[in-house]
Amino acid sequence: MEIKLPGQDAEDIIDQLLGASEEETLMQTITKEKALVRIRLENRRGHYVTIVDFGNSEDAKQLGIKDMARELKKRLAAGGTIRDSWIEIQGDHRQKIKKLLIEMGFKEENILIDEGVAET
């Protein structure tokens, strides 16, 4: 026996069950379109670390930085962590991260890549 709810598709039902509202999803989409993202490379004790910086921590929380970090690490097959409002990924993945962020809904013109390498 199949139950059908009028006016709702499977995604709506799943969102309701998991607690994600349309407003939260809409706010996250708007934030992604407006967010300014800086991608830079640091050299730490001979190893490269790619930093994806989202500016302030409130914007990062609205963007769902934890889920984003998990997805980036999985897609890049690299380790990483979250610090305040930025994601650290092991290795030089600047161009790949830019492509992935565009796929996730960020605007290309709002993603800035620093070409230099910072020594720390």
From Swiss-Prot:
Family: Belongs to the SUI1 family.
Biological-process GO terms, alphabetical: formation of translation preinitiation complex; regulation of translation; translation reinitiation
PROSITE patterns reported for this sequence: SUI1
Top-rank taxon, per record: Archaea
GO molecular function: translation initiation factor activity
CDD domains noted in UniProt: YciH_like
UniProt xrefs under InterPro entries: SUI1 (IPR001950), SUI1_arc (IPR022851), SUI1_arc_bac (IPR005872), SUI1_dom_sf (IPR036877)
Source organism (scientific name): Pyrobaculum aerophilum (strain ATCC 51768 / DSM 7523 / JCM 9630 / CIP 104966 / NBRC 100827 / IM2)
Protein name (database record): Protein translation factor SUI1 homolog
Gene3D superfamilies listed in its UniProt record: SUI1-like domain
Keywords: Protein biosynthesis, Translation regulation
